[in-house]
Regions:
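N-terminal catalytic or cofactor-binding beta/alpha core of small enzyme domains
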Residues: 1-137, 151-155, 176-181, 185-196
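Active-site-proximal C-terminal subdomain of hydrolase catalytic domains
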Residues: 129-154, 160-166, 170-171
Length: 196
């Protein structure tokens, strides 16, 4: 069986829950031949990626998918690209607020996701769940995590991707999506990880 590491984030920005972790917790333990290994990450620049890499070193996953909250988006949005930039409009959960700093000095300006992000977006949309490909993972901890993982696993067997999800309805913000629908979308994403 293939191994999947799927991560979600703790709450941040004054929220009491984070739909990324709530959804990850509701996924089954096996999907489409992948064993599902979950990991909760801190919303802290650098630390999130360090913890994900530490876990990946333990379980040697075939694929890593990171899930994050994108408040204001109304669709599930697989990310195509990560950029070598840290810019925080609000502090992370440790109080860090970098402004226009590189994630890795001398690193590539941008790196493309190594999962089939466009195919995943189209497959989720075909289920009747709002989804679209995103060309910007932002410049906060989500992008920081994706970029660092893509750099770390560049040229290895481990494929890396990121999927943003909207607020869940339980947060009382708009636009939002029910957790059940978010979970269905993520299950479908995992079912479409392989190109064939």
């Amino acid at each position: 069986m293939k191994s999947l590491l799927i991560t979600g984030f703790e709450p941040f920005g004054g929220e009491e829950i984070n739909p990324s972790w709530e959804a990850v917790c509701r996924l089954p333990d096996e999907i489409n031949g992948y064993s599902v290994n979950r990991l909760l990450l801190p919303v802290v620049f650098g630390n999130a990626a360090e913890e994900a890499i530490r876990k990946a070193n333990e379980i040697d996953p075939d694929v890593i998918i990171c899930i994050g909250q994108a408040g204001g988006r109304s669709a599930i949005t697989p990310e195509l690209v990560a950029i070598n930039l840290r810019y925080a409009k609000i502090p992370d959960n440790s109080g860090n607020q970098p402004i226009d700093e590189p994630i890795i000095v001398g690193g590539d300006n941008a790196l493309f996701s190594t999962i089939p992000a466009r195919k995943i977006a189209e497959a989720i949309e075909a289920l009747g769940i709002p989804s679209q490909l995103s060309y910007s993972a932002g410049s906060y901890v989500c992008n920081d995590l994706l970029y660092t993982l893509l750099m770390h696993f560049k040229g290895s067997k481990t494929r890396v991707g990121f999927i943003h999800v909207p607020y869940c309805t339980e947060q009382g913000k708009e636009p939002s999506m029910s957790l059940d629908i978010i979970v269905d979308g993520l299950k479908n994403a995992i079912e479409n990880l392989d190109e064939s």
